[in-house]
A protein has these predicted regions:
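DUTPase catalytic domain/fold
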Residues: 1-149
Length: 149
């Protein structure tokens, strides 16, 4: 398992929130919590950018992926609208999570509620090379559903 030290800056509205952290020793994602003054009610099909109260300085060559928490998704239909959301290494603003309620009931988000998880990943930079032909494969140009449902 690789280790990476990343600086986090606490913003004023983070208040008493702890730094993002791993819930277990085997967790791949750090839990992100809501840094809000008042509860936010997400009605069905509504989406909202929820602040976390922290900014960070990822080193070059890394990204952060914002992903849903499985319990919120399964139990309430609360998920990350642009999953996985991407935070680039040169971004220094507040981490926010775009939550969407795909369930049938209102869902209330409160200060300190764990709303998403953040996974750190290495980035590979691709150099696009224009070509007239592509290597043949068994799948060829078979698209959606071409390998079975």
């Amino acid at each position: 398992m690789n280790q990476l030290a990343v600086k986090f800056r606490r913003l004023a509205h983070a208040g008493d929130l702890a730094l993002p952290s791993y819930a277990t020793s085997g967790a791949a994602g750090l839990d992100l919590a809501a840094a809000i003054d008042q509860p936010i009610c997400l009605k069905p099909n509504m989406r909202e950018a929820i602040p976390t109260g922290f900014a960070m300085a990822l080193p070059a060559g890394y990204e952060a992926q914002i992903r849903p928490r499985s319990g919120l998704a399964l139990t309430y239909g609360i998920t990350v609208a642009n999953a996985p959301g991407t935070i680039d290494s040169d971004y220094r603003g507040e981490i926010a999570v775009i939550l969407v309620n795909s369930g049938t009931d209102d869902f209330t988000i409160t200060h300190g509620m764990r709303i998403a998880q953040m996974v750190i990943a290495a980035v590979t930079i691709m150099t696009p090379v224009e070509a007239d032909d592509l290597d043949d494969t068994a799948r060829a140009a078979g698209g959606f559903g071409s390998t079975g449902l």
